[in-house]
């Protein structure tokens, strides 16, 4: 059973999601308690590879040191694969959601590429036309 504790909804609006990864999170006891109480903010957070380790930066967890860097737990092969993909221009690794799975706190990371303003406008136009089509279908039936 998965219990979602925090979600970063702005990622889907501002970025094109290429891949998803599930990683464990190294937390202190105080941070675990704060996360379970949903005192977490993922906005502005990102993951970065330093050395051969993956770190979560700029994620606010309400404790004594709210924005400290937290180590992410992934296999070395996955980190190496991610390092190669992050070398491409315009790609970043962002936290999508924080959840509990089998009594362990996990973070879902997304390999993302930023959207341009005209891409966002296209998406809005596409959604509007789909809504109009749905309304027309509902009116016919």
Go through each PLM region and give its residues.
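A positional/architectural concept
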Residues: 2-53
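Helix-adjacent hinge/juxtasegments
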Residues: 50-52, 56-82
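Flexible glycine-/small-residue-rich
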Residues: 29, 49-51, 58, 109-113
């Amino acid at each position: 059973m998965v219990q979602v504790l925090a979600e970063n909804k702005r990622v889907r609006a501002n970025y094109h999601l290429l891949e998803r990864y599930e990683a464990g999170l190294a937390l202190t006891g105080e941070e675990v308690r704060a996360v379970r109480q949903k005192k977490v903010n993922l906005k502005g957070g990102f993951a970065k590879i330093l050395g051969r380790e993956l770190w979560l930066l700029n994620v606010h967890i309400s404790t004594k040191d709210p924005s400290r860097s937290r180590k992410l737990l992934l296999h070395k092969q996955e980190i190496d694969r991610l390092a190669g993909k992050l070398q491409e221009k315009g790609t970043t690794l962002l936290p999508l959601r924080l959840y509990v799975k089998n009594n362990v706190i996990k973070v879902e990371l997304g390999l993302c590429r930023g959207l341009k303003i005209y891409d966002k406008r296209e998406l809005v136009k596409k959604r509007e036309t789909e809504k109009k089509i749905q309304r027309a279908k509902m009116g016919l039936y």
